[in-house]
Curated annotation (Swiss-Prot):
Belongs to the histone H1/H5 family. Gene3D superfamilies: Winged helix-like DNA-binding domain superfamily/Winged helix DNA-binding domain. GO terms for cellular component: cell surface; chromatin; euchromatin; nucleosome; nucleus; vesicle. Residues 20-37, 145-179, 186-214 have a biased composition (Basic residues). It is found in: Nucleus; Chromosome. This is Histone H1.1. It comes from Rattus norvegicus.
Length: 214
């Protein structure tokens, strides 16, 4: 039996690696500014709570916290803020401390501060109404602009009138020139040159001599 030679196997080709895609760096996000909490600040809430109370001796810290909690303010988390707000209001002169020292005590609204608070409320309302009215003006101005824009395409009509009138002028001028030119040619007649004819003078005939008498 004839031995069959083993068939050589082709060298294993290594699979091509796909080109590594470059990682695109994402742009760093800009630091988002912290949003201020919507609504009045702690000091404003304290002033409102003290002004609403009818106690002549002043509002205690416990009573103030109750009124703030009823308004929906988180008293437990913002306990330190309430104390700082009370101290700052006392230092500014908006609140007067009738009893105790520091944050622990009773507080009453200063009469001068009451007049200032009323004026600030009026100015805030006026600013809010002015800000609300401004967008109406801009909307009206935008409407006027949109109305005025379609009037511009009417201008080409004037150019059509001028173009229709312009060809009439050369026709009139040409007609006049053609009418005048033959008249001039007829009026001018060439003058014939006058030639003077000199007549030849005939010689004088000799007179016959008279016969002499015998």
């Amino acid at each position: 039996m004839s031995e069959t030679a083993p068939v050589p196997q082709p060298a294993s080709v290594a699979p091509e690696k796909p080109a590594a895609t470059k990682k695109t760096r994402k742009p760093a996000k800009a630091a988002v500014p912290r949003k201020k909490p919507a609504g009045p600040s702690v000091s404003e809430l304290i002033v409102q709570a003290v002004s609403s109370s009818k106690e002549r001796s002043g509002v205690s810290l416990a009573a103030l916290k109750k009124s703030l909690a009823a308004a929906g303010y988180d008293v437990e988390k913002n306990n330190s803020r309430i104390k700082l707000g009370l101290k700052s209001l006392v230092n500014k002169g908006t609140l007067v401390q009738t009893k105790g020292t520091g944050a622990a005590g009773s507080f009453k609204l200063n009469k001068k501060a009451e007049s200032k608070a009323s004026t600030t409320k009026v100015t805030v309302k006026a600013k809010a109404s002015g800000a609300a009215k401004k967008p109406k003006k801009t909307a009206g101005a935008a409407a006027k602009k949109t109305v005025k824009t379609p009037k511009k395409p009417k201008k080409p009509a004037v150019s059509k009138k001028t173009s229709s009138k312009s060809p009439k002028k050369p026709k009139v001028v040409k007609a006049k020139k053609v009418a005048k030119s033959p008249a001039k040619a007829k009026a001018v007649k060439p003058k014939a040159a006058k030639v003077k004819v000199t007549k030849p003078k005939t010689p004088a005939k000799p007179k016959k001599a008279a016969p002499k008498k015998k």
